[in-house]
Amino acid sequence: MKIKTRFAPSPTGYLHVGGARTALYSWLFARHHGGEFVLRIEDTDLERSTPEAIEAIMDGMNWLNLEWDEGPYFQTKRFERYNAVIDEMLEAGTAYKCYCSKERLEQLREEQMAKGEKPRYDGRCRHSHEHHDDDEPCVVRFANPQDGSVIFDDQIRGPIEFSNQELDDLIIRRTDGSPTYNFCVVVDDWDMEITHVIRGEDHINNTPRQINILKALNAPVPMYAHVSMINGDDGKKLSKRHGAVSVMQYRDDGYLPEALLNYLVRLGWSSGDQEIFTREEMIKLFSLGAVSKSASAFNTDKLLWLNHHYINTLAPEYVATHLQWHIEQENIDTRNGPQLAELVKLLGERCKTLKEMAQSCRYFYEDFSEFDADAAKKHLRPVARQPLEVVRDKLSAITDWSAENVHHAIQATADELEVGMGKVGMPLRVAVTGAGQSPALDVTVHAIGKTRSIERINKALGFIAERESQQ
């Protein structure tokens, strides 16, 4: 049997981390078994579905590089197929037309709730032989079995049983002729030959209804696996107050897709004590049997740690391709300065996100208008004038511009003036970067370049001279 899974989001909002984890698990399961992964857009909610949400879902899947083998399929383009199946069910007697008014259904609901009963349709039209005109408004309901039970072996949770007496006669076509979500899902899974449905635990109650419809159609029933919810680190359902919940928001915040995927795969699944997984390792090791039944807690600090790890372990050239977007967001012109791959090497240890990296690299490419006030007050004092003059001259004399030779120039200045490296290094750092913090000074000065570094030292000397004149 060829394994076939699907990810079927509703385009009523962005791709959130819970949906992304479900997509990842479905994708990994298919890849592990050499099967196929289908992308299906469940856009039957015409009022809430938007083109922007569809685009956001596709953007998120593409950014995570969860490539699909079929699709994307859109349910709104399959209404003719759904209605044809409903008509067949009406002919076969496995579905029936219901003419009950909203007022009657509301009254029935109130009466049942007053008795402490679970609200459900009472089957009035199922057993009615009353004649109705063809143009009289009605819905179509599925004639759910009235006895027995539905048992399915959840691939994560084990056997789950529902009594058919607990299940309603589900509406499968509305009065406007549009098919409903639960019915469309069934026909799609049947037509697309889905073998394994991996989805959130909030769909468990839909499963017995969908199984009964599949059996009524004499269609094969797929295996089901329901993944637990994701909570915030406070144990409450994950929401915006816990931080970003949109996949693309994590992109915007400077996370690498490898970091988010690695974090999401471990959010409910494990393989021993291993924490870091390449995509290939995920595919090789993933199994539904190792997915936890318990809810997972989202820990932003752990994700940040993973992101920092990947910034420093993936090829700098690759990280630079993702950094480019953030550089553009900051409107930094990188034509005059180090290559972005070199920048990744320079700032990787200091920066935990690519956004942070982009926001802290401007001095490598553009001159700054003023020095950081606190850093200048502390380090650009009259006592720093001589060290800056000497190191400027030694840097000017370098013919082979390299980080090693920059280091020698700084060390030679300290030796000549018989002062500690800090007496030379800190004023020099503020002079060339405008701030009191940077990567190692030799590689920083080298990356900024000889001409620009000397110009900035002269600017700092001018700042010191002006400061002296005001005393």
Curated annotation (Swiss-Prot):
Its main location: cytoplasm. NCBIfam families: gltX_bact (TIGR00464). ATP binds at residue 240. Catalyzes the attachment of glutamate to tRNA(Glu) in a two-step reaction: glutamate is first activated by ATP to form Glu-AMP and then transferred to the acceptor end of tRNA(Glu). It catalyses: tRNA(Glu) + L-glutamate + ATP = L-glutamyl-tRNA(Glu) + AMP + diphosphate. This is Glutamate--tRNA ligase. Belongs to the class-I aminoacyl-tRNA synthetase family. Glutamate--tRNA ligase type 1 subfamily. The lineage of its organism: Bacteria, Pseudomonadati, Pseudomonadota, Gammaproteobacteria, Enterobacterales.
